[in-house]
Amino acid sequence: MISPTGNESYEEFLNAFRFSFSSVNSYNNCPRCFWLSYLQDPKLEQSENAFAQWGSFMHSIYERFYGGKLDFFDICAEYEDQYHQKVTIQFPPNAWVDLNKKYYEAGLDAIELIDDLPSHISVLDIECKFRLKIRDISFVGYADLILQNTETEDIIIVDHKSKSKFKSKAEQKEYARQLYLY
């Protein structure tokens, strides 16, 4: 287990630990899961799964499109051509729906909605890594897309979610915490 060493207190140890939205959320949902995922030594092996592969693939499409490396007219063809090379693991069985079909179609539906940004919105950064301290506690985060309204100078932070729709306003509020941190 990773824990304080020598004369280091738990407070000093936690102040030295770099938190992320995922680690804070993990602790909030299940402290034991947090310990197993972030503090256990040696670390647990993380196995790949279809959900993670699909999410990474979707993020790569958004990143390349908004970064100017993937043309609007090629985006659907890129998704269809690359899908089975990027999502190589089958989704788990589900009694009510074929998750393989559902996620394929959901991804296609999502990218069909991608549109060029309005002329007054500019891209400041894509997959922006940032570090900050809040009351001496270190945080790290990755913003998918940082935009600016050139008319108002407002900053817009976009976080692409690869999950299905929010089940409730409470769940949506829980996910909004990530944007507040950013």
Regions found by a protein language model. Give the residues of each.
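A non-catalytic, helix-rich entry segment at domain boundaries
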Residues: 57-129, 133
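Short amphipathic alpha-helical segments and their helix-coil junctions
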Residues: 11-16, 32-44, 83-87, 157, ...
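Mg2+/Mn2+-dependent nuclease catalytic core
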Residues: 128-182
